[in-house]
Curated annotation (Swiss-Prot):
Enzyme class: transferase
Full protein name: HPr kinase/phosphorylase
Binding annotation for Mg(2+): 158, 200
GO molecular function: ATP binding; magnesium ion binding; phosphorelay sensor kinase activity; protein serine/threonine kinase activity; protein serine/threonine/tyrosine kinase activity
Positions with a binding annotation for ATP: 151-158
Domain of life of the source: Bacteria
Upper lineage: Bacteria, Bacillati, Bacillota, Bacilli, Bacillales
Record keywords, A-Z: ATP-binding, Carbohydrate metabolism, Kinase, Magnesium, Metal-binding, Multifunctional enzyme, Nucleotide-binding, Serine/threonine-protein kinase, Transferase
Other comment: Both phosphorylation and phosphorolysis are carried out by the same active site and suggest a common mechanism for both reactions.
Regulation (activators, inhibitors): Kinase activity is activated by fructose 1,6-bisphosphate (FBP) only at low concentrations of enzyme or at high ATP concentrations.
Organism of origin: Staphylococcus xylosus
Any single Pfam family the record assigns to this protein: Hpr_kinase_C
PANTHER family per the UniProt record, alphabetical: HPR KINASE_PHOSPHORYLASE, PROTEIN YJDM-RELATED
Assembly notes: Homohexamer, arranged as bilayered trimers.
Length: 314
């Protein structure tokens, strides 16, 4: 649960009034600058949002007649309002301080400029209030691509991750991956605090990757881009040998590219994952080897077909 108190501590803000409301829960990622409300229009006032007051809002407020000021601020401070933040180290109006105390609305000041603070708060709130889920798998950063390795228990996910780490790649999470959907089509994965930096190898036990391989072998969090699903090789199953079949894995409301890799003795899965990551990077740059091969093949078939027709005409 995200509260106003945690926001104050995170951004080192200064409390002015309304300390009794510090445990209010923040539920909305949106932030408002109540310009219309300062003018007296409260019909669509989003009172459940954090309110930012900067130079523009307070300059207009100072132009209001004395008899309107107190009522305006009492309407601004609602029981459901998580916080009102005055930026640029400006002096909060006395009427606002009184209203904040009356309605137990946290009144906070910040030295940061309004636009800059809004940007930082939005990023923070989207991250903290994002939808979350957990998946069984291993998350590794391979050539800058967040690769989620999944498969049945005992298939060799952790062993593959260990080989990737030895080859210079970085571990994010093993066994349990916490995933946040911080925005549309953007998933961020990390390890639970309890198992951070740890890797379980059957027959060996739990190892601390950072202790063994150094700080450069681990990463706190990584954006998920590619899913490598490991499964035992089935003779009767037809596997994609060209790369034209597009599979996806849906996590929350976001889909990421999925590649199914059959596992059997003699296959170096770590190298295959490295190549898959590099090939994914080429694909997002607009280079698709499978499609280029398919185009060349179709052109060759068409050319041979035309040559055959010309021979028949002769």
């Amino acid at each position: 649960m995200l509260t106003t108190k945690s926001l104050v501590e995170r951004f080192e803000l200064e409390m002015i009034a309304g300390e009794a409301g510090l445990n209010k829960q923040i539920k909305n990622t949106d932030i408002s600058r109540p310009g219309l409300e300062m003018a007296g229009y409260f019909s669509h006032y989003a009172s459940d949002r954090i309110q930012l007051l900067g130079t523009t809002e307070l300059s207009f407020y100072n132009l209001l007649p004395d008899e309107e000021r107190k009522g305006r601020m009492r309407k601004l401070c609602r029981p459901e309002t998580p916080a009102i933040i005055v930026t640029r180290d400006l002096e909060p109006p006395e009427e606002l301080i009184e209203a904040a105390k009356e309605h137990e609305t946290p009144l906070i000041t910040s030295k940061i400029a309004t636009t800059q603070l809004m940007s930082r708060l939005t990023t923070f709130l989207e991250h903290e209030l994002a939808r979350t889920t957990s998946l069984h798998g291993v998350l590794v950063d391979v050539y800058g691509v967040g690769v989620l390795i999944t498969g049945d228990s005992g298939i060799g996910k952790s062993e593959t991750a260990l080989e990737l780490i030895k080859r210079g790649h970085r571990l994010v999470a093993d066994d349990n991956v916490e995933i946040r959907e911080i925005s549309k089509d953007e998933l961020i994965g990390r390890a639970p605090k309890l198992i951070e930096h740890l890797l379980e190898i059957r027959g060996l036990g739990i190892i601390n990757v950072m202790t063994l391989f150094g700080a450069g072998s681990i990463l706190t969090e990584k954006r998920l881009r590619l899913n490598i699903h490991l499964e035992n090789w089935h003779k009767e199953k037809l596997y994609d040998r060209v790369g034209l079949n597009e599979e996806t894995l849906r996590i929350l409301d976001t889909e990421i590219t999925k590649k199914t890799i059959p596992v059997r003795p003699g296959r170096n899965v770590a190298v295959i994952i490295e190549v898959a990551a590099m090939n994914y990077r080429l694909n997002i740059m607009g280079i698709n080897t499978a499609e280029e091969f398919n185009d060349r093949l179709n052109a060759e078939i068409l050319r041979n077909g035309n040559n055959g027709n010309n021979g028949e005409e002769k």
